[in-house]
């Protein structure tokens, strides 16, 4: 490829504080192992007036997952070495237990444990300890799809990996990372700090320019799925290590970033803690990270030996910034989607009965729709009267049915339009035997509210909103991890006499949790 258009790249970076508004951040571009651009702006602590620098450490959150998998490959070998240990760990399972490779590739079908903390009554700013993580993970008995068939993001996969690695080696993950990964890569200040409450070198902020920026409170303990704190310079060193070892057939990053497949042979979007993407026909590998008050993203294009890194101490769209930086470095112009006018027949709520997932669509103007299906809203471009797509999802409408496809997830669902009114007779207490947790629904002044109760406590009351007959939505916008699970979908079941017998509760991260009415 030709040389990087440095003025264009610098112009984009210098506009980041205006386009991604927040207290501060740090970004870098690396090509051929050399630093093309290294920049920090703003403040690491607004009250203390402490400036942000490339040496400022921040939590890299889920970017940590690739390093957990790197320790696995470097210290133990192929994932199958730990399959017997995983069987002992998930000893509540009958059939359908995932393999360790499924964990590494987010194909386990296990429900995300941070989402499940909501169902177990956790407070968003509550304390979450290591024994509570094991308590939750070891009680699991089922998956929400057959392992190896689909992709679903699951932090618990990597929490379990960390436990298995420590058990197998007899050493802490912190020591293994320092010795086997950080030292060889010259990541001089990178460190695993599992307790988020202990990190105080830089402040993460929640909020925005409308509501103001407030210091985020985090008191969770995480391991394997996240927990590493590193500076921009540490992350640059990681990209340089990747470039130095690019020709080594057994090089760590080559092994981490090797293509993966589903059980049916279809290409998978994720492997060994890395997300696989494509831009302008070029393959990218990388990962994002999020915690209340923090966002980060790294991408690497092996074909062109280019990496981009974005780290924010606020909840800005670091993934968007990192991809746009990569496109600028690669000389890929912004896409210009062709849009059609929205047909009102799109709008409303649509249910897939098999998974209990709900798709909600509303007009976003300019030939676009806002879709709610996963953890957050997606903006869909309407490309024809009955077709729409985003970067993740393709929709094809056929009357009162939408065919939803998420190619990266190997997922194809028939969504049926919800018609009619929801009955109000859902108040009561419901029990999940697998989670040993309750859902309490009450009616106050004609409005329905719900709360979750379990071994982590009793949640606040949340309002419910009707989506259609026996289908309700319960939005949860703050939880222990970030982003939050989003809207919980509640699909109620009745007997032949029309009495409520139970409810299926789920979201994209944790589908099909069955509750019976008490």
Swiss-Prot record:
Summarizing the function annotation, the protein's role is: Hydrolyzes N-terminal residues in D-amino acid-containing peptides.
- MF term (GO), any: aminopeptidase activity
Assigned protein family = Belongs to the peptidase S12 family.
The UniProt note on how this protein's activity is regulated states: Inhibited by beta-lactam compounds such as 6-aminopenicillic acid, 7-aminocephalosporanic acid, benzylpenicillin and ampicillin. Inhibited by p-chloromercuribenzoate.
Binding of substrate, residues = 481
- Name the SUPFAM superfamilies for this protein: beta-lactamase/transpeptidase-like, D-aminopeptidase, middle and C-terminal domains
Question: What's its top-level EC category?
Answer: hydrolase
UniProt cross-references to HAMAP family, sorted A to Z: D_aminopeptidase (MF_01960)
Q: Give the multimer and partner information.
A: Homodimer.
Alphabetized, the UniProt keywords read:
Aminopeptidase, Hydrolase, Protease
Its BP terms in the Gene Ontology are: proteolysis
Specify the superkingdom. Answer: Bacteria
InterPro entries linked to this entry: Bact_CellWall_Synth/Modif, Beta-lactam-related, Beta-lactam/transpept-like, D_amino_pept/lipop_sf, DAP, DAP_B_dom
- EC annotation from Swiss-Prot or TrEMBL: 3.4.11.19
Statement: the UniProt record of this protein carries the keyword Hydrolase: yes
Q: Under what name is this protein listed?
A: D-aminopeptidase
Q: Where is the active site?
A: 62 (nucleophile), 65 (proton donor/acceptor)
Name of encoding gene: dap
- Region feature (Important for specificity): 477-487
Under catalytic activity, the entry for this protein gives: Release of an N-terminal D-amino acid from a peptide, Xaa-|-Yaa-, in which Xaa is preferably D-Ala, D-Ser or D-Thr. D-amino acid amides and methyl esters also are hydrolyzed, as is glycine amide
């Amino acid at each position: 490829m030709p040389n990087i258009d440095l003025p264009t790249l610098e112009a984009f970076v210098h506009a980041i504080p205006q386009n991604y508004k927040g207290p501060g951040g740090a970004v870098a571009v690396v090509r051929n192992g050399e630093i093309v651009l290294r920049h920090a702006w703003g403040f690491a602590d607004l009250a203390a007036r402490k400036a942000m620098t490339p040496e400022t450490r921040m939590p890299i959150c889920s970017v940590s997952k690739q390093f957990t998998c790197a320790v696995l490959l470097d210290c133990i070998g192929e994932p199958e070495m730990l399959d017997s240990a995983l069987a002992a760990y998930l000893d509540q399972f009958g059939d359908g237990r995932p393999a360790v490779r499924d964990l590494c590739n987010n194909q386990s079908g296990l429900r995300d444990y941070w989402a499940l903390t909501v169902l177990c009554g956790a407070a968003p700013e509550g304390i979450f300890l290591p024994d509570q993580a094991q308590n939750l993970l070891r009680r699991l008995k089922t998956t929400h799809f057959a392992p190896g068939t689909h992709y679903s993001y699951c932090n618990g996969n990597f929490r379990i990996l960390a436990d298995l690695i420590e058990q197998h080696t007899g050493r802490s993950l912190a020591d293994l990372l320092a010795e086997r990964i950080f030292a060889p890569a010259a990541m001089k200040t990178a460190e695993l700090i599992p307790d988020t409450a202990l990190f105080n070198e830089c402040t993460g902020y929640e909020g925005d320019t409308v509501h103001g920026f407030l210091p985020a409170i985090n008191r969770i303990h995480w391991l394997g799925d996240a927990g590493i704190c590193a500076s921009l310079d540490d992350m640059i060193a990681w990209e340089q290590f990747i470039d130095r070892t690019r020709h080594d057939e057994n090089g760590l990053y080559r092994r981490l970033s090797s293509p993966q497949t589903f059980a049916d042979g279809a290409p998978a979007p994720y492997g060994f803690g890395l997300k696989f993407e494509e831009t302008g026909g070029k393959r990218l590998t990388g990962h994002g990270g999020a915690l209340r008050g923090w966002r980060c993203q790294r991408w690497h294009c092996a074909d062109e030996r280019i990496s981009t890194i974005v780290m924010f101490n606020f909840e800005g769209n670091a993934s968007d910034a990192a991809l746009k930086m990569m496109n600028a470095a690669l000389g890929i112009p912004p896409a210009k989607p062709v849009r059609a006018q929205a047909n009102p027949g799109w709008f409303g709520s649509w249910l897939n009965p098999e998974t209990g997932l709900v798709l909600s669509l509303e007009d976003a103007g300019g030939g676009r729709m806002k879709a709610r299906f996963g953890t957050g809203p997606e903006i869909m471009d309407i490309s024809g009267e009955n077709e729409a797509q985003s970067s993740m999802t393709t929709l094809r409408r056929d009357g009162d049915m939408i065919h939803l496809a998420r190619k990266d997830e190997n997922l194809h669902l028939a969504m049926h339009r919800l018609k009619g009114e929801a009955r109000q007779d859902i108040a009561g207490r419901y029990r999940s035997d697998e989670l040993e947790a309750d859902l309490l629904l009450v009616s106050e002044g004609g409005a329905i509210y719900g709360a979750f109760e379990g071994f982590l406590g009793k949640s606040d009351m949340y309002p419910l909103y009707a989506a259609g007959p026996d289908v309700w939505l319960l939005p949860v916008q703050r939880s222990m991890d970030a982003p939050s699970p989003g809207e919980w979908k509640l699909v109620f079941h009745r007997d032949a006499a029309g009495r409520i017998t139970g409810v299926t509760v789920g979201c994209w991260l944790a589908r099909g949790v069955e509750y019976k009415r008490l």
